[in-house]
């Protein structure tokens, strides 16, 4: 399940579109179905067909962002595309109808949203957990970039944010693990298990200009055993800085 922001921009380059298509095709060829909704990064401000629709039309993945529940292998899945905060009040009835439509369904019920929940991030919050339909057994969430899972007494299942699968420019460079959730629904409860991805390491270092050579040595030691070349950010402070000296030191990292 892709909970929105399949791409980082509404108009990704051709390589990204093909790579994603090939990956979804591989899933399909191995009898693994996938589902997706749209996040704000998938939706252009200019009215045009979102790129991910290509995968739905080709049969590689199924679009479920229209709020209509579908039954799949004994599971009920429903999703909604990104809702702007200013439009949230219009969706109260939609949430209520979703709740009623799945209430008597005996199997697991999954709701896919691309929203910020205030209890997870008060600055990015667009709705409270109490605003959500209460009868779903798993809430697959997109939008927030950090991993987090919470269970609330008023909901029948956990709210799970796997976060982004790669650091983005808005997050800056930091040492953080990325991954996704594999959810066990063999029992009455949905149990998310964290699967860590082998992403490219990213490090940020602060140094005084006079200590740059020493800092570069420390960086070389830190990254010497990595299998993937990392992304390195070096913040340098000082006076009478010579750019040639900086370039010579940074070149040691190549």
Where are the regions a protein language model picked out?
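Intrinsic structural disorder
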Residues: 1, 27-31, 107, 215-217, ...
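Active-site beta-strand/loop signature of hydrolases that rely on acidic residues for catalysis
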Residues: 1-8, 39, 234
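Conserved beta-strand positions
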Residues: 2, 113, 141, 234-236
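Short acidic, S/G/P-rich loop/turn micro-motifs used as interaction or catalytic elements
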Residues: 7, 84, 118, 239-244
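Short, glycine-rich nucleotide/cofactor-binding loops
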Residues: 7-15, 209-211, 226
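His/Asp/Glu-rich metal-coordinating catalytic cores
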Residues: 10-177, 181-184
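Accessory, non-catalytic peripheral segments of nucleic-acid enzymes
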Residues: 185-254
């Amino acid at each position: 399940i892709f909970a929105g922001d399949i791409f980082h921009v509404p108009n990704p380059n051709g390589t990204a579109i093909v790579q994603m298509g090939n990956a979804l095709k591989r899933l399909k060829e191995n009898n693994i179905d996938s589902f997706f909704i749209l996040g704000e990064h998938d939706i252009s401000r200019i009215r045009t067909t979102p790129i991910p629709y290509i995968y739905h039309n080709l049969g590689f993945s199924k679009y479920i962002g229209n709020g209509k529940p579908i039954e799949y292998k004994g599971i009920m899945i429903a999703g909604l595309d990104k809702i702007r905060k200013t439009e949230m009040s219009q969706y109260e009835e939609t949430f209520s109808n979703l709740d009623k439509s799945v209430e008597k369904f005996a199997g697991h019920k999954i709701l896919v949203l691309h929203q910020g929940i205030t209890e997870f991030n008060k600055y990015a919050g667009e709705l409270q957990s109490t605003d959500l339909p209460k009868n779903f057994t798993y809430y697959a969430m997109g939008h927030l970039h950090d991993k987090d899972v919470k269970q609330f007494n008023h909901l029948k299942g956990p709210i799970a944010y796997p976060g982004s699968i790669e650091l983005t420019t808005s997050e800056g460079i930091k040492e953080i693990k990325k991954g996704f959730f594999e959810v066990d629904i063999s029992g009455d409860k949905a149990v998310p298990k964290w699967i860590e991805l082998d992403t490219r390491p990213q490090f940020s270092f602060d140094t005084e200009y006079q200590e740059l050579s020493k800092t570069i040595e420390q960086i070389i030691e830190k990254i010497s055993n990595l299998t993937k070349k990392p992304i390195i950010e070096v913040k340098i402070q000082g006076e009478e800085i010579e750019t040639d000296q900086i370039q010579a030191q940074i070149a040691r990292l190549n």
